[in-house]
């Protein structure tokens, strides 16, 4: 599962005099992706052990996307996605028809920006950096439920094991400010603002 995300203010380039041809204008950058890797041994991706009854749904009336599939043992899995403009987050909800059947590794990587190195701790991951003008920060948080659910941070990502349900919250942003001569503001507060946005939505 890959959730690719963007943000309208993630641009390379610098402020420039348009009479000079706009040579410093730069270009839009792809922010990155969050991946959900299945760790459940019910899937071995052979012809006999792969997912069955797979289908996708896009509901334009409530702006949600869904994916449904089953494993070889008949357990049904649902993944639901929504991007909330008021909360300024992307959310994904992972469920299974039987308790304790969700085991997933969540990780993230940068998009078109080179050299991004995510870090993982406790219940989420983050990466940050600076382009020529703007600084950027992205973060995700996982919230599992279930009596046997566990969460562990590794070098490869956040591992959720034996959960009944998992909620993923993702947000990203920059310090771009069109009203400042430098086109940036509150750089030191950016990481905290993104973290607060994710925690509030969770």
What are these regions (language model features)?
Residues 1-202:
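Aromatic-residue-lined binding/catalytic grooves and analogous aromatic/hydrophobic interfacial grooves
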């Amino acid at each position: 599962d890959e959730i690719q995300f963007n943000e309208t203010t993630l641009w390379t380039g610098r402020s420039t005099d348009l009479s000079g041809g706009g040579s410093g204008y730069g270009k839009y950058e792809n922010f990155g992706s969050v991946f959900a890797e299945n760790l459940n041994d019910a899937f071995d991706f052979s012809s006999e052990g792969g997912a069955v009854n797979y289908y996708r749904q896009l509901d334009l009336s409530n702006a949600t996307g869904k994916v449904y599939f089953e494993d070889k043992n008949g357990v049904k899995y649902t993944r639901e996605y929504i991007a909330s403009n008021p909360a300024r987050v992307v959310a994904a909800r992972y469920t299974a028809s039987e308790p304790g059947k969700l085991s997933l590794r969540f990780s993230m990587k940068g998009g078109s920006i080179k050299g991004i190195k995510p870090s993982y701790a406790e219940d989420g991951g983050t990466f940050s950096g600076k382009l020529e003008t703007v600084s950027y920060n992205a973060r995700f948080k996982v919230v599992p439920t279930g009596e046997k659910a566990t969460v562990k941070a590794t070098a490869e990502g956040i591992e959720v094991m034996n959960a009944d349900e998992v909620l993923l919250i993702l947000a990203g942003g920059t310090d771009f400010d069109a009203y400042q001569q430098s086109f940036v503001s509150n750089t030191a507060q950016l990481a905290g603002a993104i973290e607060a946005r994710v925690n509030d939505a969770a």
